Amino acid sequence: MTAWLDFPLALSPLVVVSMKGGSFGQGSEANGSPQLTGLSECGADRIFLQGQAGIPGIPGVPGTNGLPGAKGDLGPQGPPGERGSTGIPGKAGPKGDKGDQGEACSLASCQQQEAGAKDCKELLDRGETLTGWYMIYPTTGRGMRAYCDMETDGGGWLVFQRRLDGSVDFYRDWEAYKKGFGRQVSEFWLGNDKIHLLTSSGIQQLRIDVEDFNNSKTFAK
């Protein structure tokens, strides 16, 4: 009987035993062969023996990083963010061009002006009850447009300053305050010259109305 055995026990936990032209059985300590356990027959001439697991080997060297992937598609647009706080008012724009000269006053129109109301209170007494801009004549022949409040505190108040939303820049020089500036539909300053004309025509009463960001209102006069 010719037989040969291969025991790669030091390299792999799987031991393959091959036989040719004979049979193979369990060895014994008497004949000097180690006792084999876990034998199973597979086929006509091969027996597989499962040995104990070996010691784990040393980890291999890490491989190189792969190339960067392709750029992904843009994601969907996110929801709009919250509105930020109101910024600081910008600087005043350049001075506008001088307007065209008005027409001379005719005799009929001058007489009508002389008969005009001298202030908002007189307009209210004449039956004007809507708040808005009116033409008044504090002195004879000198008219001006003024905003009359016909609702607050009995009505008849002439508004010479109104600030609501910061849409008009109030950081201006003396010349601007002298002539007046702003927008009739929002914020404005009537003008120092016009205020002087109003206050010099008689005794006036001043009323100041204020409102905070919580819509709380108060006044003083």
From Swiss-Prot:
Residues 1-25 form the signal peptide. Belongs to the ficolin lectin family. Veficolin subfamily. SMART domains: FBG. The keyword Transferase does not apply. It comes from Varanus komodoensis. The keyword Secreted applies. One of its GO terms (molecular function) is signaling receptor binding. It comes from the Eukaryota. It is found in: Secreted. This is Veficolin-1. One of its GO terms (biological process) is complement activation, lectin pathway. Residues 54-104 are annotated as: Disordered. Residues 111-221 form the Fibrinogen C-terminal domain. Residues 50-104 form the Collagen-like domain.
